[in-house]
Every structure is written in C-alpha cells, then in structure tokens.
Amino acid sequence: MSTATFVEIILAIILPPLGVFLKFGCKVEFWICLILTLFGYLPGILYALYIITK
C-alpha cells in the first residue's frame, strides 16, 4: 500500500467524497459517493473504502 492510498483511505473515513475525489476526480464514482454520504454517513464510507481499495 502506497502513502497516497493510505491518505485516501484516511480521508475516506473522515470525509468519504473527498477521498474518492482525490482518486477519481468528478467522475461518476464521486457523485455516487456523495449521494450515499448524503443518505447516510456509513454507506458513504463503505462505498468510498470499496472503490478506493478496488
């Protein structure tokens, strides 16, 4: 695991859309994560961790 991935994982736990944004930009992954985070914090975290570590 690289340092960048570690930082993205930490950011995904603190603020899920930010971690996804740093990895993918404003693509569909970011918007899905943002919507899931608005529906509930836990779904946003789970999706962000899944998509970053995939």
Swiss-Prot record:
One of its GO terms (biological process) is response to cold. Its main location: membrane. PROSITE patterns: UPF0057. It comes from the Eukaryota. The chain crosses the membrane at residues 2-22, 32-52. Belongs to the UPF0057 (PMP3) family. This is Hydrophobic protein RCI2B. It comes from Arabidopsis thaliana. The gene is RCI2B.
